[in-house]
Structures are given as structure tokens and as C-alpha cells.
């Protein structure tokens, strides 16, 4: 039997709420964060387009097990729609496909907003990660194919105007569900207003349960990053190699359990925690312990231990974390 290779990197776990700069792709951002923390494992909770900036929650280590909970969270975006052009990508990156000299008034736009709140039907952009017969829509679009992307239901909790810099642009803020394409929102509003439109600025400012206050910039991360061991003229590490101190950058990591604010959380005793670590159910004690829950998590000494469900006052683990 082949021996498994040793994992490279540190077994650090938690969330880094990265303030992604414009021009950086989501995959590139994950690779950068993984390298800065020298982490064994990393992944993000929801793609952010390269032309967009703002919050990209990145999970390290065991926190990758909680990614689905963050992906399901409500998102808030601030964005600018430039009127007068519809573009192939529905943002600045594409070429103009339709143009108009019409420009909407504030009253025109405000009258339209109720049509875009609540549960609405939306067709994702041609340039999107949606799979069509096993292929990404953006790959097909780059090959010149026009694909039929089925509409999907999304939920818009709030959509409002936050600024009008000039007649050509309107600034909005939207609070929406997972799967909402803000580019499609701009495209559809432009069509309904008879003037066409595309996204010219896009920033994500919240991914529940995390807020903009949790975000850290690349500059802040690099400032806290421990330098690599010194090398001589031949590129060899100078001996003895000093141990790298990651404490400053690790202080920017948010606890794994923060992603599970939507779930009931129950603290366990040390004995109960040991049983759960072995995959066994435990009876929950205390007046406040829930009797039933489709999903819940348990903690030990303030650290997340497991996700599972509660049935007749008994917690049954489904996913156990090594950090607890």
C-alpha cells in the first residue's frame, strides 16, 4: 500500500474575511491567503468576480467544513449601474451589444425597484460559472456560443438607491440571497427602463454572519506576515533556522464556530466531549438544552466540536472537528 504523503503547511483552522481587491480572482485570493498563513487547506465561500472588490470569506483547515453555512448566508452589495449600454458580460469587461441615448430619471428608477424585491425570476449572465451540459457557461461564451441558461428564483430582501453621481450612473445597495447575480439585476433593470445598463462598480460588503468590520486587507495581512528564513548568496537557508512566529497574522483569524451563528449551540462537559469525539451520541443536560433540532452544534471549552442534530434531548454528531 502506498504511503500517504505528509500534508504541507500548518494545521490552522478558522475564517479569514478577506477584503479582495479589484482585479484579483477568487481562486488567486485563496492561494494567496493559504500561502500567507502556510495553511494545509483553504477554500472560499462564494466566488467574487475579478472586477468586484470586497468580502471574500476564506476558510482555513477545519473551517472548510462550515463553508456551506456561509455560502447560504445573506449577501449585501453596493454597485453602480452605467446606463446606455448593455454588454456581453453585463459588466465593464465585455463589449457593447446594445446602446441607447435614453437615461432614466430617479423617479423612473424608484418606480421600478418594487418589481425587483421579494422572490424574483432571474437568468444568470452568459459569462457565469453555471454549468450547461457539463460545461461552464463562460467557457461556451468565450467560444462564441450563445447558450440558453434557465431562469432561477432568487430573493431580494432590499434594493435601494444610495447615490446618483450623474445622469449616466446610479448607485445601489442590495441585500439578497445566495445565487443572485447583481450583473443580471443591472441588465434587467436597464431593459425594463428602456435604456440598457451594465455594472461599472461592484463591492460586496456583507456575507452573513460576517460583516465589513470583520474584513482584513491584503496590506494588513502582509504587514502581520512573518518573514521567510534568511538565505545566503547561494539561496540556502542560513543555519540555525529561526522558528517563524505566526502569532500576529493568526490573530486576524476568526474562530471556526463563528460561521454557525444560525445554529443552536450547546456547551458540553469534558466527558461528553470525549464521547462525541468518538462519534457517539450524548444526552444534553441543563434547563436550556433543546430537546429537538434538525441541526445544532456543540462546543467544548469554547471551541466548536461537532455539528449534528438533536432528537429527544440527545445530540447525535454528523461531523466532528479536530479543533475541539
UniProtKB/Swiss-Prot annotation:
Q: Which GO terms describe its biological process?
A: mRNA pseudouridine synthesis; tRNA pseudouridine synthesis
**Which keywords, in A-to-Z order, does the entry hold?**
Isomerase, tRNA processing
User: How is this protein named in the record?
Assistant: tRNA pseudouridine synthase B
Q: Does the keyword Glycoprotein apply?
A: no
Which SUPFAM superfamilies does this chain map to? Pseudouridine synthase (SSF55120)
Q: Which NCBIfam families match?
A: TruB
Family named by the database record: Belongs to the pseudouridine synthase TruB family. Type 1 subfamily.
Q: Name one Pfam family in it.
A: TruB_N
Q: What does this protein do?
A: Responsible for synthesis of pseudouridine from uracil-55 in the psi GC loop of transfer RNAs.
Q: What is its EC number?
A: 5.4.99.25
Question: Any idea which residues are catalytic in this one?
Answer: 49 (nucleophile)
Gene Ontology MF term list: RNA binding; tRNA pseudouridine(55) synthase activity
What lineage is this protein's organism placed in? Bacteria, Pseudomonadati, Pseudomonadota, Alphaproteobacteria, Hyphomicrobiales
